[in-house]
């Protein structure tokens, strides 16, 4: 037995010591009885489950338990290439027949028709298929059947797809990708995993023989390696019969090739990886401790549940400590965290990582190691353990409460894990009961006794990743070896318990304000008008039992703030403030501990024209949510030292981020769209000098000191009788001072007029051209135009997929985004965005522009319009089982007098026509406002 196996054995011994006779860790876990599970004679596995969230929809999956790690050298990248080819011709769906058929019933490529290739497995999915006719179920299963054994792999189609995949590789070849390659070589040193890239080399993608692809397909795509999963609003018995009839015809493999089981060698001394890159944005050091995975024969037993539970407890307590340290003044690191996980079939890891200021990576790593040694030496305190247990059990409870609202995709993933990795598929109700039983029985001493087996000296890997820039000294391997030795000999003090039972506020001191008027509202809402003038619109739902969403809204926003305050509330800076702010007299670390076991959050927001508080949580914690909303208005926390902790993070990484092509491009795009308006601050190195906590405090004071004119939207599982007194107490106590509500100001934040070219060169390691074409102008904001914009972007998606992706092989994809604003002006912008090779860029840019011109003069492809219309019709009922959708519908109606729900389907059927799409696109491009933001690689 290797040392790597000892951690599991420690858990097994704990199981026997503390759990025997109450819950039996060696007994099988109870599988979800609602899943129909079976296996055909040819070896194919199937899972079927009935679910009506959403109604008349189903997900169809085929999972092949093989990924890129089984490729031969000549097949490098072909597992992923094959995934593409499954959509490029099969026995019953020649050419693009699968995509064409699925789009004809309202599904969308990329969203509902997709696939994913991993190192260990490959999955193909048809999501949210409208199973409104029996024939659609039959056809969806036929698609899976073709994936399983009847993909054409036509050499002509293969050659056409090479360019698409090479462009996908170009798009993915970022600093993150290069860093992941270096990390894999260290973690998997001495094994095939170290060189498994999934996407393959450019040389092999360009030159492989089609027969190699066919060989991979015929070797691995076979019934004994495949599972069919169908979850949705279907008849389980009927679907099982269809699967047996259709898939039993797949031939059983003769002399099937077994999968190679690839192990990772043990290492006695630490493996150290040092990687630098000019485009890397931060210094990161990560410690990996390699462990043997839970043997498959144990995964179906209670011990696997206990194992996972103890890992959650340990990482939760460690992360609380590390988070607290990161928020102190002069912290040794900017951020840190730990987690457990599987990174391949034959290895699990415990990892602990830190983000440091440039040049301080070794110091940060030492601080991290000291915390691990502290846990190993002294264990955790009882108050830490109690908080961790409470939070974990609350997460299980929330999952139990929301079990009935799970949508198909949430139900599919545990079934995939069961097939590929033998992890059991249990119910949230069973998980909650089991977790509670274990948490009630496993004492803190059991956790602390297991830590020495976790924090060992062998099988360690350390990865250091940092920016490569002048003047920054890169550490060497010895620095990290010395850091490990330092932590082991350091003088470490035992942790001190920190407990606070202080309430958020004295609720008895609030005077409140009674509901003076109650009226039935639109969409099943109830409208309360409080004596202080605040209007509360409540939409009770039961879509998620353990969720309530609250939004307070009043006019003004950034538009009424002095221009000198705006840099300090730029969206990224404001987010940093929120992450570190806390509330009232409580720091963020204190607040987190005070909210142990509660699902409650509330944060202020400032948009261009509005301000308010966004809150969400559990109905059980509704009073806490209301208290947080109240405190955001009356006691925002603006502590200079706490803000500086977060601000230091952005100051540390921003100069490096400006060297990343994608980030730099986004800055230039935002700057060009802002058109030089000082009221549109863009995060860059210059902006940093204009930011202060005092200006944040002033902005919050102006925005939240007076709640006059505020509307409050509450959506979710609320009882009006329970909610009403809380609204009267907390919303009724918000400060209302002025007689008249503020109004937003039109600050003329308009995009540039005319044809504007912003082309620039940028130094990058992987040469590519990034294109953004922004069309803009005036257009009426109404439901008809919103629908036409959604349909038009869909039509353009299909158009560019055909012309630029498939015909030219010029890009992995063209992103099309269209937005219509109603305030302060009724206007729009349409953004076309893609990456490509510099040599192809001019041609593709002209093709993108001409695509719009052709539609405006000749009309769109009629089939594309039909598919776009069907997609809008299909998507409409799917949204209606989500609280977020109804929160938006109610807000638009009561704040902007826009009804985006009533007669929606009728309107779609009426207006989504080729003629209207043609007119709509013509209306947009005829205004002759186009901003071209194009980044080319700087010549080396």
For each feature predicted by the language model, list its residue ranges:
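Bacterial Sec-dependent N-terminal signal peptides
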Residues: 1-23
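Proteolytic maturation boundary segments
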Residues: 20-45, 235-309, 315-323, 327, ...
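M16 family metallopeptidases and their MPP-like homologs
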Residues: 49, 54-71, 77-79, 96-146, ...
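Active-site His/Glu-centered metal-binding helix of metallohydrolases
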Residues: 78-86, 314, 574
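Metal-associated gating/positioning segment near the N- to mid-region
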Residues: 85-93
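Peptidyl-prolyl cis-trans isomerase
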Residues: 101, 150-158, 171, 442-446, ...
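Hydrophobic, small-residue-rich alpha-helical packing segments that form membrane-like cores
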Residues: 157-225, 229-231, 236-245, 251-261, ...
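Internal metal/ion-chelating core segments
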Residues: 204-243, 677-682, 687-729
């Amino acid at each position: 037995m290797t040392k790597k196996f000892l951690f599991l054995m420690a858990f097994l011994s704990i199981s026997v010591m503390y759990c025997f006779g109450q819950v039996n860790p060696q007994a099988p876990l109870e599988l979800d009885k609602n899943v129909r599970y079976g296996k055909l004679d040819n070896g194919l596995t199937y899972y079927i489950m009935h679910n009506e969230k959403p109604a008349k929809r189903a997900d169809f999956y085929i999972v092949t338990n093989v990924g890129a790690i089984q490729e031969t050298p000549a097949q490098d990248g072909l597992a992923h290439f094959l995934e593409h080819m499954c959509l490029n011709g099969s026995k019953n769906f020649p050419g693009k027949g699968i995509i064409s058929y699925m789009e004809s019933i309202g599904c969308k490529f990329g969203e509902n028709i997709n696939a994913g290739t991993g190192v260990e497995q490959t999955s193909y999915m048809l999501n949210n298929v409208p199973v409104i006719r029996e024939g659609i179920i039959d056809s969806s299963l036929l698609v899976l059947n073709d994936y399983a054994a009847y993909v054409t792999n036509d050499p002509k189609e293969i050659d056409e797809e090479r360019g698409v995949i090479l462009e996908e590789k170009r798009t993915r070849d970022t600093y993150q990708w290069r860093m992941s390659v270096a990390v894999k070589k260290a973690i998997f040193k001495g094994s095939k995993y170290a060189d498994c890239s999934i996407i393959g080399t450019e040389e092999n993608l360009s030159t492989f023989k089609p027969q190699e692809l066919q060989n991979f397909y015929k070797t691995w795509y076979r019934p004994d390696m495949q599972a069919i999963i169908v979850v949705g609003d279907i008849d389980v018995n009927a679907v099982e019969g269809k699967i047996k009839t259709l898939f039993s015809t797949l031939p059983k493999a003769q002399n099937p090739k077994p999968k190679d089981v690839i192990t990772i060698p043990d290492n006695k001394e630490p493996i150290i990886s040092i990687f630098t890159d000019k485009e890397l944005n931060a210094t990161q050091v990560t410690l990996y401790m390699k462990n043997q995975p839970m043997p498959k024969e144990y995964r179906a037993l209670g011990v696997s549940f206990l194992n996972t539970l103890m890992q959650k407890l340990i990482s939760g307590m460690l992360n609380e400590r590390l988070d607290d340290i990161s928020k102190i003044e002069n912290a040794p690191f900017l951020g840190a965290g730990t987690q457990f996980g599987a990174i391949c079939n034959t290895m699990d890891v415990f990892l602990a990582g830190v983000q440091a200021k440039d040049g301080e990576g070794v110091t940060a790593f030492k601080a991290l190691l000291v915390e691990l040694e502290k846990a190993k030496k002294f264990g955790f305190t009882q108050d830490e353990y109690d908080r961790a247990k409470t939070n974990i059990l609350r997460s299980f409870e929330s999952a139990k409460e929301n079990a009935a609202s799970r949508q198909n995709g949430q139900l599919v993933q545990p079934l995939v894990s069961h097939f590929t990795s033998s992890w059991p598929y249990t119910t949230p109700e069973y998980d909650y009961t089991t977790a509670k039983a274990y948490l009630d029985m496993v004492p803190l001493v059991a956790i602390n006794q297991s830590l020495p087996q976790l924090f060992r000296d062998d099988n360690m890997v350390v990865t250091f990743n940092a920016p490569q820039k002048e003047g920054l000294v890169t550490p060497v391997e010895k620095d990290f070896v010395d850091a490990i030795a330092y932590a082991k000999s350091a003088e470490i003090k035992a942790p001190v318990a920190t407990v606070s039972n202080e309430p958020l506020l004295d609720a008895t001191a609030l005077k409140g304000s009674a509901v003076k008027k109650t009226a039935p509202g639109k969409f099943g809402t109830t409208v309360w008008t409080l004596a202080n003038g605040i209007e509360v619109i409540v939409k009770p739902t039961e879509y998620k039992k353990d969720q309530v969403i609250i939004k307070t809204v009043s006019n003004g926003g950034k538009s009424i703030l002095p221009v000198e305050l705006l840099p300090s509330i730029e969206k990224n800076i404001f987010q940093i403030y929120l992450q570190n702010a806390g509330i009232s007299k409580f720091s963020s670390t204190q607040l987190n501990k005070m909210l142990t076991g509660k699902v409650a959050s509330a944060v202020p927001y400032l948009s261009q024209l509005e301000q308010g508080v966004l809150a969400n949580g559990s109905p059980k914690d509704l009073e806490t949510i209301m208290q947080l909303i109240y405190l955001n208005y009356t006691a925002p926390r603006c502590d200079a030292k706490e803000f500086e902790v977060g601000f230091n993070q952005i100051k540390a990484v921003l100069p490096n981020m400006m060297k990343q092509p994608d980030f730099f491009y986004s800055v230039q795009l935002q700057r060009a769209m802002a058109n030089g308006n000082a009221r549109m601050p863009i995060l860059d190195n210059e902006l940093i000098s204009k930011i202060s906590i005092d200006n944040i405090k002033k902005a919050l004071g102006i925005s939240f000191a007076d709640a006059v004119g505020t509307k409050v939207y509450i959506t979710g599982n609320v009882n009006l009788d329970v909610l009403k007194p809380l609204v009267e107490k907390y919303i009724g106590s918000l400060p209302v001072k002025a007689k008249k509500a503020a109004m937003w100001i039109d600050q003329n934040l308009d995009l540039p007029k005319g044809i504007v070219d912003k082309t620039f060169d940028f130094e990058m390691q992987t040469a590519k051209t990034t294109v953004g074409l922004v069309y803009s102008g005036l257009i009426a904001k109404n439901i008809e135009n919103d629908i036409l914009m959604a349909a038009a972007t869909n039509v353009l998606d299909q158009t560019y997929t055909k012309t630029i992706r498939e015909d030219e092989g010029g890009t992995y994809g063209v992103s099309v985004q269209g937005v219509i604003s109603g305030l302060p002006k009724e206007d729009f912008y349409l953004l076309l965005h893609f990456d490509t090779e510099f040599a192809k860029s001019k041609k593709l840019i002209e093709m993108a522009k001409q695509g719009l011109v052709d539609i405006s003069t000749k009309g769109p492809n009629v089939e594309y319009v039909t598919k776009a219309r069907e997609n809008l019709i299909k998507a409409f009922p799917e949204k209606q089982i989500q609280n977020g959708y109804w929160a938006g519908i109610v807000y638009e109606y009561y704040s902007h007098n826009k009804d985006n729900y009533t007669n929606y389907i009728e309107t779609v059927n009426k207006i989504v026509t080729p003629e209207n799409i043609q007119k709509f696109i013509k209306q947009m491009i005829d205004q002759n406002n186009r901003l071209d933001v194009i980044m080319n690689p700087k010549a080396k």
